[in-house]
Amino acid sequence: MKIKVISRSEEEETKEKASDVRKLHRNLDPNLHPFERPREYVRALNATKLDRVFAKPFIGSLSGHTDGIFTMTRHPTLLNNVASGSCDGVIKLWNLTSLTERTTVQAHNGFVRGLVFTPDGKHMVSCGEDKTIKMWKLDLPEYTFNQEVISIYNGKNAFTSIDHQLNSTTFATSGPTSVEIWKHQRSTPIQTLQWGHSTITKVKFNPIETHLLASCTTDRDIILYDIRENSPAQKLTTSMRSNSIAWCPTESFTLAIANEDENVYQYDIRNLSKAMTVHRDHVGSVLDIDYSPTGREIVSGSYDKTIRIFPVDSYKSREVYYTNRMQRIFSVLFTADSRFILSGSDDMNIRVWKANSSAPLGILSNREKEKLEYQDKIKEKFKEIPELKTIATHRRVPQLVYKRRFIKNEIHKAKQRRVKNISNNSGKSPKVEKVLSKHTIKVDN
């Protein structure tokens, strides 16, 4: 007679330490687990509820400025080093690890309009309304700077923004009518690019195709330049003015625009006739935007005193952050590891937020990491179930934002009803403006 017995090795089954996890033996045959899907649904529901319970996005604030924060920039090599410039001409360096101030300097008379680190991280360049550009040397290893200025570049007009080309000594500034290209070693601009006579408010270098440059103007234009030539390449005219622009760090052809019409637009510069995506949850002018270093999300700061995080392929925001004391948000910034967001507002504070509101901040064991990955998978699997979707997407917002959002939705529904009624009563289909193309007025080459 043949008898089957369970045979196990003593070495494999014996724990070396009392804290070791005992190995569990499972039979993964689906016929033995008829309630596998209901169990996964309950786990997904519990994980979604716990996400909302542990959603504590606010980490802390960086206080010390005596005026509104107008611009911020992150260090290219240090995760915890950030610089900020305020409306009273003060520049401060911050340590994000300890949420403390490294150093401060009175840099300009008037607004600090632009701030950027050089690609090697050893210098910082700032520009202001006092018609000067100043280069500061960072003292290693603390990465602080003293009151001494290495170089001063004088301009004919006030500067509105600045950006540095990657792996080069070239930087660009914007002003009342033109974009100027500078070198560290030259006291005058080596190149002047102009298209029209309106004030250029923002300028940004492409991080991949480093010879490409984008700018936005006060007369609703987005202008693209190629600094290898002495003339602009393309001009996009939009329905309303743009306040800020940002290049995608992973796709050289994707450009995001923060607009006065309360939306964020993503354009493919190879085809500017229509937008790729429209992100439309704000109820006030969008003042600043920034891509995450992964290129998968966009953070935006608005005149409605809220911060929103958008997936690049979704028109709805994933998260909305606000506090009772936070005012108009002039500047937003992702940290280099994509885990945190900085916001600079008119209330003289920089606030630090988690990009994922329920993410733990401590060091995780391998089992904890596996658990979080599993929960993310099952939440993704059941995300379209109405009960889970309601819990996952529900957010509390200020009453003013809620009312404006309600009115905005009612206007949108009324337009849809009007189109439907015209079609039903006249027998003709009215011409409907497409969402992706109605923002574009014209494209000039």
Swiss-Prot record:
Write down the InterPro entries for this protein, in alphabetical order: G-protein_beta_WD-40_rep, Sof1, WD40/YVTN_repeat-like_dom_sf, WD40_repeat_CS, WD40_repeat_dom_sf, WD40_rpt, WD_repeat_DCAF13/WDSOF1
Q: What's this protein's family per the entry?
A: Belongs to the WD repeat DCAF13/WDSOF1 family.
Q: What is this protein called?
A: DDB1- and CUL4-associated factor 13
Q: Where is this region: Disordered?
A: 417-445
Which function does this protein serve? Possible role in ribosomal RNA processing. May function as a substrate receptor for CUL4-DDB1 E3 ubiquitin-protein ligase complex.
| Pathway assigned in UniProt | Protein modification; protein ubiquitination
Q: GO CC annotation: what is one?
A: Cul4-RING E3 ubiquitin ligase complex
